[in-house]
């Protein structure tokens, strides 16, 4: 189901949601951090979704063990590097990795700015070794409040040339986008792209707000757009992309099952929607699974899957020249 003549992308992928269980085990031992299990087999149920979680917030707690072992900046650098290695193993040509430095720093009071630097270093080294093209998206974790998001924003701005876009993630219901208007004004002033998690836990009004008030060019998840025909028309007309994450939306109980997922309808409506992983380490999936198992189960035809793959590159925060070069590089292989 993957067209090997086209670039394969993953543009909604959380770096801090893709920490290998083996790495959690090794870092726990290295830093003498008490873990809920002492073998890989017994640790996996604590760090990966085995059965669907009742809601988004419950799902997010599965990420916590991954960041609890980030006891040093070297550990942050390692997981960033391994994210690129994983992308290469999955056959990805281009990946946009998003991360919340405040979340990664929290367990061991690491300097937020240091975490940003460590992630940049790890990703840069991974790209050099594995040949994957990558860009970084800074996440503000809305769950921790406006002040914490401000701290994350300042850390990103200090290295603004290494950051491609700003995102807002976390508890969408408890912390609506209206709390973060000034943050996104500064992001746009910095020349960054904007993508926002919206329409996952909250309704279509959250998506409208992300677009109209925060300046979103893309929407993360966006499943609730299906409830608003005018919104779907607007997304299609304005070419505002939806970063779909099929398995994730089932595991968070955002959507009942794959057959009920709106991605197929979005594509039929002419919306620029793509296929992505979200938190592959926590979900126990990869991009290949999403294309070859999840997408067909969601009712997508072979041509719709190909269109979603094309959309992934068209939606990417790359220049027209960068997109052309990537297409030519893949076609020449």
UniProtKB/Swiss-Prot annotation:
Its cofactor is Zn(2+). CDD domains: ADA. Keywords: Hydrolase, Metal-binding, Nucleotide metabolism, Zinc. InterPro entries: A/AMP_deam_AS, A_deaminase, A_deaminase_dom, Ado/ade_deaminase, Metal_Hydrolase. One of its GO terms (cellular component) is cytosol. SUPFAM superfamilies: Metallo-dependent hydrolases. Its EC number is 3.5.4.4. The record marks 221 as: Important for catalytic activity. GO terms for molecular function: 2'-deoxyadenosine deaminase activity; adenosine deaminase activity; zinc ion binding. It catalyses: adenosine + H2O + H(+) = inosine + NH4(+); 2'-deoxyadenosine + H2O + H(+) = 2'-deoxyinosine + NH4(+). The keyword Metal-binding applies. The active site is at residue 200. Zn(2+) binds at residues 12, 14, 197, 278. It comes from the Bacteria. One of its GO terms (biological process) is purine ribonucleoside monophosphate biosynthetic process. Substrate binds at residues 14, 16, 170, 279. Binds 1 zinc ion per subunit. Pfam families: A_deaminase (PF00962). The keyword S-adenosyl-L-methionine does not apply. It is an enzyme of class 3 (hydrolase). Belongs to the metallo-dependent hydrolases superfamily. Adenosine and AMP deaminases family. Adenosine deaminase subfamily. Catalyzes the hydrolytic deamination of adenosine and 2-deoxyadenosine. This is Adenosine deaminase. The lineage of its organism: Bacteria, Pseudomonadati, Pseudomonadota, Gammaproteobacteria, Enterobacterales. The gene is add.
């Amino acid at each position: 189901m993957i067209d090997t003549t086209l670039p394969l992308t993953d543009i909604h992928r959380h770096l801090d949601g893709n920490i290998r269980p083996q790495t959690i085990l090794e870092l726990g031992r290295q830093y003498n951090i008490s873990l809920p299990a002492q073998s890989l087999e017994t640790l996996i149920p604590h760090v990966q979704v085995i059965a669907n979680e009742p809601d988004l917030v419950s799902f997010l707690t599965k990420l916590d063990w991954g960041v609890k072992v980030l006891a040093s900046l070297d550990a942050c650098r390692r997981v960033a590097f391994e994210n690129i290695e994983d992308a290469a193993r999955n056959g990805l040509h281009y990946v946009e990795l998003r991360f919340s430095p405040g979340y990664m720093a929290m367990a061991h009071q690491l300097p937020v700015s240091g975490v940003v630097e460590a992630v940049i270093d790890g990703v840069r080294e991974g790209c050099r070794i594995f040949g994957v093209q990558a860009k970084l998206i800074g996440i503000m974790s809305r769950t921790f409040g406006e002040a914490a998001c401000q701290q994350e924003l300042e850390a990103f701005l200090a290295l603004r040339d290494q950051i491609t876009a700003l995102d807002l993630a976390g508890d969408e219901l408890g912390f609506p986008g209206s709390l973060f208007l000034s943050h996104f004004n500064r992001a746009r002033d910095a020349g960054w792209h904007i993508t926002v998690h919206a329409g996952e836990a909250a309704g279509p009004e959250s998506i409208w707000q992300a677009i109209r008030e925060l300046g979103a060019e893309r929407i993360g998840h966006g499943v609730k757009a299906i409830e608003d025909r005018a919104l779907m028309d607007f997304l299609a007309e304005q070419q505002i992309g939806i970063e779909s994450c099929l398995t994730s939306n089932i595991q968070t109980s955002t959507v009942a099952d794959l057959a009920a997922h709106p991605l197929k309808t979005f594509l039929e409506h002419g919306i620029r929607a793509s296929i992505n992983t979200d938190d592959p380490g926590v979900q126990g999936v990869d991009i290949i699974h999403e294309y070859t198992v999840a997408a067909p189960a969601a009712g997508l035809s072979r041509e719709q899957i190909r269109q979603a793959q094309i959309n992934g590159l068209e939606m990417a925060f790359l220049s027209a020249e960068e997109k052309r070069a990537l297409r030519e590089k893949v076609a020449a292989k």
